[in-house]
Design a protein with these regions (language model features):
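Chymotrypsin/trypsin-fold serine protease catalytic domain
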Residues: 79-105
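Short, solvent-exposed turn/loop segments enriched in Gly/Ser/Thr/Pro and often Arg
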Residues: 39, 68-71, 87-88, 158-161
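Structured loops at beta-to-helix junctions and adjacent beta-edge loops in soluble globular domains
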Residues: 13, 41, 85, 97, ...
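Residue-level signal for well-ordered alpha-helical positions
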Residues: 23-26, 76, 85, 97, ...
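Short aromatic-cysteine micro-motif
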Residues: 1-78, 99-119, 194-195
């Protein structure tokens, strides 16, 4: 169990293709739609998006969430398998996954939000987080505001995607992906520091 002591904002939705194009000028996504989540972006691509967004805004507040922040926000106070409890039968109300996606992404915020008003925390696209992946990191990590290992070869993605089955579109599973990988089920959402 970990705790988050520093307040932060997390975007209600995954970054859309329209938002990506406004900053980057082109759309790398396989499944086109202005309000669909941008996908087919690497962790490195996302860092460049964040750099440009912060420069445009004249700030340094936008970033990826840490893995701990992401799970805290996904769960929204729940201790269940999913943000809404343990009933897999309810997943289609909250998530685009392999049983209902038609093998593609969908516009953000078309499924029910979690208790804190965050959409698509399960499914649609997996989401990059800031942390390096460490298989045993959480067995000895700080219990308050863990930030992942100091280095590594892979980054963490969370949340599952449109092509995952219900057993992988959960609140807790962690997946490791090299930071240069692009995939049509992989996107992100922004966090914003408050200080």
């Amino acid at each position: 169990r970990v705790s988050i002591s520093k307040a932060f904002y997390l975007a209600k939705t995954e970054v859309t293709q329209e938002q990506w194009v406004a900053i980057m000028g082109s759309n790398p996504s396989e499944y086109k739609g202005r309000q669909n989540p941008v996908e087919n972006v690497s962790w490195n691509d996302v860092q460049e998006f964040i750099r440009r967004l912060n420069a445009k805004e004249g700030s340094n507040v936008y970033r990826l969430p840490t893995e701990a922040e992401w799970e805290y926000a996904c769960r929204a106070g729940s201790t269940g398998t999913y943000s809404f409890g343990d009933d897999k039968g309810d997943l289609g109300t909250y998530a685009w996954f392999d049983e209902n996606s038609g093998e593609r992404t969908h516009p953000v915020a078309t499924k029910r939000a979690n208790a804190w008003g965050l959409y698509d925390m399960h499914g649609n696209v997996m989401e990059w987080v800031q942390d390096w992946y460490g298989e045993t990191y959480y067995s000895s990590s700080p219990s308050t505001d863990p930030r992942g290992p100091a280095s590594g070869s892979d980054r963490v993605v969370r949340g599952g995607s449109w092509d995952f089955d219900a057993g992988f579109v959960l609140a807790a599973p962690r997946i490791r992906v090299a930071p240069g990988v692009r995939y049509d089920g992989l996107g992100f959402r922004l966090a914003r520091s408050l200080s």
